[in-house]
Curated annotation (Swiss-Prot):
The keyword Ribonucleoprotein applies. Keywords: Ribonucleoprotein, Ribosomal protein, RNA-binding, rRNA-binding. GO terms for molecular function: rRNA binding; structural constituent of ribosome. Binds to the 23S rRNA. HAMAP family: Ribosomal_bL9. InterPro entries: Ribosomal_bL9, Ribosomal_bL9/RNase_H1_N, Ribosomal_bL9_bac/chp, Ribosomal_bL9_C, Ribosomal_bL9_C_sf, Ribosomal_bL9_N, Ribosomal_bL9_N_sf. It comes from Cupriavidus necator (strain ATCC 17699 / DSM 428 / KCTC 22496 / NCIMB 10442 / H16 / Stanier 337) (Ralstonia eutropha). GO terms for biological process: translation. One of its GO terms (cellular component) is ribosome. This is Large ribosomal subunit protein bL9.
Length: 150
C-alpha cells in the first residue's frame, strides 16, 4: 500500500515521504495513529496544501522535546528495590518503574520512551538508560538501583 507520512517514522521516512508498506502495517498502526494517509491523488493534493502547517507543528514538537531533553540529560534517578546479600534484586527494575520515578520528578514520560538495551535491571548499582523524547532526541539518564535488605 502506498502511503504519505504525516510525521517522521523511524526506519520508514520523514514528513511528506510517499512510501510503500505492507497493508496490515498501514491499516493497523500508521493510519489509526495519524502517522500516515493513503497516497491517493486527492490525499496528496490535500497534503501539499497542509504541508507548511504540518512542518511547523513537527518543528514545535522537536523544539519542545529538545528543551525537555536539556532538563533531563545527565539526571540521576534513585530507585529502591528489595535485594539479596549478593546485590541481586528480588524482581527487577523495568522501564515502567523508571518512567514512574521520572514522573515523580516532574517529567511526563510513557514507559515506551524509556529504552533499556540490556533488558530490565536486576543488579544493585548505577545503570545508564536512554530516554527517547522524540525520534531525533534521545537522552541518557543514570538509574541508581539501591538495595533494601530483607
Amino acid at each position: 500500500m502506498q502511503i504519505i507520512l504525516l510525521e517522521k517514522v523511524i526506519n520508514l521516512g520523514n514528513l511528506g515521504d510517499i512510501v510503500k508498506v505492507k497493508d496490515g502495517y498501514a491499516r493497523n498502526f500508521l493510519i489509526p495513529g495519524k502517522k500516515a494517509r493513503r497516497a491517493t491523488q486527492t490525499a496528496i493534493a490535500e497534503f501539499e496544501v497542509k504541508r507548511a502547517e504540518l512542518e511547523k507543528a513537527a518543528a514545535e514538537k522537536l523544539a519542545a522535546a529538545q528543551a525537555e531533553g536539556e532538563k533531563l540529560s545527565g539526571l540521576s534517578v534513585q530507585i529502591s528495590q528489595k535485594s539479596g546479600v549478593d546485590g541481586r534484586l528480588f524482581g527487577s527494575v523495568t522501564n515502567a518503574d523508571i518512567a514512574e520515578a521520572l514522573a515523580g520528578q516532574g517529567f511526563k514520560l510513557e514507559k515506551a520512551q524509556v529504552r533499556m538495551p540490556n533488558g530490565p535491571l536486576k543488579m544493585v548499582g548505577d545503570h545508564p538508560v536512554s530516554v527517547a523524547l522524540h525520534t531525533d532526541v534521545v537522552v541518557d539518564v543514570t538509574v541508581s538501583v539501591v538495595g533494601e535488605s530483607v
